[in-house]
């Protein structure tokens, strides 16, 4: 029986998940888990990429010890961050995190040289201050001159494992430098940030085979035989592939550190409404586009849990939140102040004081403020999607860690007036594995793969609670409009 391994690394943790098809169902095992996080070093928030690679090998050793002698492997991580590689094939610095404050005003600075309209028309990508375009705009110019290749994080990991350098196109689209329709880097934008297309490896689609690990690794670690496949390397792209897609007019919410809400299209949408609402057209796998908005996610809850010294589990925090009345305060969760504050609890409380609202004090009140306002923000975005697409979204498929937060899922269903299907929580790893299975010929296509997902995992169904919170979305929208002036 073939074994497939998903290396799935997020901003706060990583894991190696092993998947196999048994009697038409996908069985998953977590083989290794490890922490992740940036650290302040040499004046910037940076990722320890060498540590992440070492953890991958530790996981592969566990897989070998468990009796798996030959596996397929795919890698996905968060988007936008990159590694600068010199002519000797080594990294020039530890990669800087998208949460680093160096790009806080970069959109305003760069768009004095090239218009927002040009950038959006060319790339179709949402304006976010941490996009690769703005990171490179702030990059050390002397370092860029020494750079032979600019590699996105998962491409760099694949390069270290196999010695083969590629640029996977779905993740490349998140840079805000890839032309929307041609699928090539836009030379005008590259020039504005002092790089050239030669500094990127060949663009490839998900499903491209990189091949075996470098022989050197087998002398250092006890490893199975590994065949590396380039999957949809942005974790959200993999998560969408791993979404069951219930409903006729469906949308998805990949709910993790970030929330990514949108729908899947065959043709990109970069018209006036999409530009006004700052929606993105990221490339997906197999000729699709992920039309979505990247907004705040469970990062706020993760910070609060940490600031409470991890004395509560996430399920315990959700229980405490359930004892509190929702919508006691309105919060624009997408405000930049919540991206990387010194203390999230204090930042939420300060926001409520500044806006003249009830200040949450207890852990339950703070968590309810987060969950209820995330639900409001999701509902608000669904109403925008309705307007842009010209039809009512009737179903929201929630995948990722947030699919386990029943309280938030029910609030979202009720406020947005949509059916919510929650799960699987491991959609990213599942989508990663599904691309590998399609590449190997074990699954015919994504459509059949999604049917396998529906049959293999417990998907919870939430329906709107009629008559509850009927005015709260309109009130929240008024609050946001007033705040934005």
Can you name each region flagged by the protein language model?
Residues 41, 61-97, 126-130, 158-179, ...:
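Short beta-strand-loop/turn "lid" adjacent to the catalytic site in phosphate-handling enzymes
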Residues 6, 18, 111-123, 137-152, ...:
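Active-site core segments that coordinate phosphate-bearing ligands/cofactors
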Residues 100:
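Carbohydrate-associated surface elements
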Residues 51-64, 182-188, 377-384:
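Short, well-ordered amphipathic alpha-helical segments that serve as non-catalytic structural scaffolds
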Residues 69-77, 149, 202, 391-400:
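Short glycine-rich phosphate-binding loop at a beta-alpha junction
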Residues 131-137:
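A charged, well-structured terminal subsegment
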Residues 76-81, 206, 255-258, 395-403:
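Glycine-rich beta-strand-to-loop/alpha-helix junction loops that act as flexible
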Residues 1-93, 146, 218-228, 416-418, ...:
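N-terminal glycine/serine-rich phosphate-binding loop of ATP-dependent small-molecule kinases
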């Amino acid at each position: 029986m073939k074994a497939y391994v998903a290396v799935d690394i997020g901003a706060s943790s990583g894991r190696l998940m092993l998947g196999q098809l048994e009697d038409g169902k996908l069985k998953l095992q977590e083989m290794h888990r490890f922490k992740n996080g940036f650290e302040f070093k040499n004046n910037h928030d940076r990722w320890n990429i060498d540590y992440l690679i070492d953890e991958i090998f530790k996981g592969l050793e566990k897989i070998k010890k468990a009796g798996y002698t030959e596996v397929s492997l795919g890698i996905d991580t968060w988007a936008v961050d990159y590694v600068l590689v010199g002519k000797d094939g080594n990294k020039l610095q530890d990669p800087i995190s998208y949460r680093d404050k160096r790009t806080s005003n970069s959109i305003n600075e760069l768009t004095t040289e090239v218009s927002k309209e040009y950038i959006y028309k060319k790339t179709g990508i949402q304006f976010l201050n941490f996009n690769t375009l703005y990171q490179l705009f702030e990059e050390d110019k002397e370092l860029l001159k020494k750079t032979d290749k600019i590699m996105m994080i998962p491409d760099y990991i694949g390069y270290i494992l196999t010695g083969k350098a590629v640029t996977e196109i779905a993740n490349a689209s998140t840079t805000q430098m890839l032309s929307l329709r041609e699928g090539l880097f836009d030379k005008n934008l590259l020039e504005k940030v002092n790089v050239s297309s030669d500094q990127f490896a060949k663009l490839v689609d998900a499903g491209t085979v990189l091949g075996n690990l470098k022989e050197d690794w087998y002398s250092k670690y006890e490893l199975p035989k590994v065949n590396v496949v380039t999957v949809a390397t942005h974790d959200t792209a993999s998560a969408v592939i791993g979404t069951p897609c219930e409903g006729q007019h469906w949308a998805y919410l990949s709910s993790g550190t970030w929330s990514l809400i949108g729908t899947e299209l065959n043709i990109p949408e970069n018209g006036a409404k999409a530009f006004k609402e700052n929606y993105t057209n990221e490339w997906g796998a197999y000729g699709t586009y992920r039309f979505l908005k990247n907004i705040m996610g469970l990062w706020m809850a993760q910070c609060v849990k940490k600031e409470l010294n991890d004395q509560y589990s996430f399920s315990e925090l959700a229980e405490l939140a359930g004892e509190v009345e929702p919508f006691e305060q309105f919060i624009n969760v997408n405000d930049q102040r919540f991206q990387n504050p010194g203390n999230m609890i204090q930042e939420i409380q300060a926001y409520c004081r500044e806006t003249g609202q009830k200040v949450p004090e207890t852990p339950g009140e703070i968590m309810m403020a987060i969950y209820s306002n995330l639900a409001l923000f999701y509902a608000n975005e669904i109403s925008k999607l309705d307007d842009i697409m010209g039809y009512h979204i009737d179903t929201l498929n929630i995948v990722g860690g947030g699919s386990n937060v029943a309280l938030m899922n029910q609030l979202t269903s009720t406020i947005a007036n949509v059916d919510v299907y929650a799960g699987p929580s491991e959609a990213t790893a599942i989508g990663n594995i599904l691309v590998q299975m399609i590449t190997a010929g074990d699954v015919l296509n994504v459509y059949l793969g999604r049917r396998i997902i529906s049959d293999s995992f417990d998907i919870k169904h939430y329906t709107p609670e009629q008559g509850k919170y009927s005015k709260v979305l309109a009130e929240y929208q008024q609050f946001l409009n007033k705040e934005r002036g």
